[in-house]
Curated annotation (Swiss-Prot):
This is Exodeoxyribonuclease 7 large subunit. Heterooligomer composed of large and small subunits. It is found in: Cytoplasm. Bidirectionally degrades single-stranded DNA into large acid-insoluble oligonucleotides, which are then degraded further into small acid-soluble oligonucleotides. Belongs to the XseA family.
Length: 454
C-alpha cells in the first residue's frame, strides 16, 4: 500500500513550490480593495503591510521599484485599491500578495486629486496675493454664474434685492454639477469677460458632498477664474466647504448669501451713514468757524499791543549780538586751525622716515650675508655625508666579494645553491662571476665530509 502511494508523496519544499505555481498561474493579477494596517518601510525601501476587511486579512509586499510610482503616502486605516499578484512565500509557506500599483479608494481618490491640483497651482503662483484684483467699491453691476434653477441663485437675488434694489444683476446660467459643468462654468466666465457688462462676478453653488462640488475643483475652472480680468468672488457650498476655486478667486465668501452681502451696498445703512455724516459736518463747521473767530480776536489784540517799530528794534539788537558772536567764533576757529597745523608740521619734521630706511637696508644686507654663509655650510656638510655614504655602500656591496674571486650559483628555478643536495647529475645551474654569468651542467657531485672537532 505504501509503495503504491510513493509517487504522490511531496516534500515540504515541493509542496510549497507547487502551491505557489498554482496560485500564480491560475489567479494571475487581481484587483483588491481593503484597509491598510501594520504598514512598515525598512531601509530597503520596500513596503510591507496588511490589507484587511471586517472578517479577513492578507499580508502584502510592495517593492521599491513599484511603490516609487505611488503618488501618496499610505496611512494606517486608509482604504485603498491595489492591483496585485497572488503568490506564496516558500520558505515559510505564507500566502501573500505582491502589489504592483495602489490608489486611494472612493472619496479618498478625489481628495488625493484635490491635494495634487492644489499643490500644482500653488507652485505656479495662482494663489499668490499679488494677483488678486480688488473688488469695486461700490459695484455698479454684478454678474452671477450658477445654476438658474438652484437655491444659490435664489439666495443671491434675495439678498441683493433687500440690500440694494437698484443694483443691476446679469445672470450667466451654467451647470454646477456633472461632467459638463466645468466646461459650462469656463464658458460663462469667458463670456462675461468678453461682454464687459459687469464689474464683479459671483461664481458658486449651494452645499453638497465632495463629488457634488467637484466641478469647482476642476483645473479648467481654476485657470479661467485666474485669467478673468473681472474680479471674482467664489461662493461654493457652506463655510466648511473649501474648493480650488476659493484659493484662485479674488475673494472667498463662505456662502452664496455672504457673497451677495460682500458685493452690494445696504441702502438703509448708507442713508443712515449720510445723515450721521451731515450732522458731524455741521458740527465741525460750527466748531471751525468759532475757533477761527477766537483766533482772529487774539491776533488782533496782540497786533494792537506790539508796534512794528518796536519789534524791528528788538530784532536789530538780536541780529547785532549774533553777528558779534559769529565773528568771535570764526576767529577762534582760525586760531585753533593754525595751531593744529604748526603742531602737525613739527611732528612731521621729527619723524623723518629716511634714517629708518637706512637701518632697514643695513639689516637686510646682514641677513642676506648670513643666509649665503649658512647655505654654503649646509651644502658642504651634505656633500661630505654623501661621500661617506657612498664609501660605506661600496664596502658592503656583494660585487666587491665577487671581485675577490668568489661566485654565486643559482638553480634553474632561481634559488641560490647553498648545499650539494639541492642538485643532481644532469641539472643545469648558473654561476655569477665578477664580469658575467656561466651556465653549466652538473656531471658529478662530491660532498665534503664534515670534520668533527674534539
Amino acid at each position: 500500500m505504501l509503495s503504491s502511494q510513493t509517487s504522490s508523496i511531496f516534500t515540504v519544499s515541493r509542496l510549497n513550490q507547487t502551491v505557489r505555481l498554482l496560485l500564480e498561474q491560475e489567479m494571475g493579477q487581481v484587483w483588491i480593495s481593503g484597509e491598510i494596517s501594520n504598514f512598515t518601510q525598512p531601509a530597503s525601501g520596500h513596503w510591507y503591510f496588511t490589507l484587511k476587511d471586517d472578517t479577513a486579512q492578507v499580508r502584502c509586499a510592495m517593492f521599491r521599484n513599484s511603490n516609487r510610482r505611488v503618488t501618496f503616502r499610505p496611512q494606517h486605516g486608509q482604504q485603498v485599491l491595489v492591483r496585485a499578484n497572488i503568490t506564496l512565500y516558500e520558505p515559510r509557506g505564507d500566502y501573500q500578495i505582491i502589489v504592483e500599483s495602489m490608489q486611494p479608494a472612493g472619496e479618498g481618490l478625489l481628495q488625493q486629486k484635490y491635494e495634487q491640483l492644489k499643490a500644482k497651482l500653488q507652485a505656479e503662483g495662482l494663489f499668490d496675493q499679488q494677483y488678486k484684483h480688488p473688488l469695486p467699491s461700490p459695484a455698479y453691476c454684478v454678474g452671477v454664474i450658477t445654476s438658474k434653477t438652484g437655491a444659490a441663485l435664489h439666495d443671491i437675488l434675495h439678498v441683493l434685492k433687500r440690500r440694494d434694489p437698484s443694483l443691476p444683476v446679469i445672470i450667466y446660467p451654467a451647470a454646477v454639477q456633472g461632467e459638463d459643468a466645468p466646461g459650462q462654468i469656463v464658458r460663462a466666465i469667458t463670456l462675461a469677460n468678453a461682454r464687459k457688462e459687469c464689474d464683479v462676478l459671483i461664481v458658486g453653488r449651494g452645499g453638497g458632498s465632495l463629488e457634488d462640488l467637484w466641478s469647482f475643483n476642476d483645473e479648467r475652472v481654476a485657470r479661467a477664474i485666474f485669467a478673468s480680468t473681472i474680479p471674482v468672488v467664489s461662493a461654493v457650498g457652506h463655510e466648511t466647504d473649501v474648493t480650488i476655486a476659493d484659493f484662485v478667486a479674488d475673494l472667498r465668501a463662505p456662502t452664496p448669501s455672504a457673497a451677495a452681502e460682500v458685493v452690494s451696498r445696504n441702502q438703509q445703512e448708507l442713508l443712515r451713514q449720510m445723515q450721521t455724516a451731515c450732522q458731524r459736518l455741521e458740527m465741525a463747521m460750527d466748531y471751525y468757524l468759532a475757533n477761527r473767530q477766537r483766533r482772529f480776536s487774539q491776533l488782533y489784540h496782540r497786533l494792537q499791543q506790539q508796534h512794528p517799530q518796536l519789534r524791528l528794534a528788538r530784532q536789530q539788537t538780536t541780529l547785532e549780538r549774533l553777528r558779534q558772536r559769529m565773528h568771535l567764533a570764526l576767529e577762534n576757529q582760525l586760531k585753533q586751525a593754525n595751531q593744529r597745523q604748526q603742531r602737525a608740521s613739527q611732528r612731521l619734521r621729527q619723524q623723518n622716515p629716511q634714517p629708518r630706511i637706512h637701518r632697514a637696508q643695513s639689516r637686510i644686507q646682514q641677513l642676506e650675508y648670513r643666509l649665503a654663509e649658512n647655505f654654503r655650510a649646509r651644502l658642504s656638510e651634505q656633500r661630505e655625508r654623501f661621500g661617506n655614504t657612498v664609501t660605506h655602500l661600496e664596502a658592503v656591496s656583494p660585487l666587491a666579494t665577487l671581485a675577490r674571486g668568489y661566485s654565486v650559483s643559482t638553480a634553474t628555478d632561481g634559488n641560490v645553491l647553498k648545499k650539494v643536495k639541492q642538485l643532481k647529475v644532469g641539472d643545469m645551474m648558473t654561476t655569477r662571476l665578477k664580469d658575467g654569468w656561466v651556465t653549466s651542467e652538473v656531471t658529478a657531485i662530491k660532498p665534503v665530509k664534515k670534520i668533527r672537532l674534539g
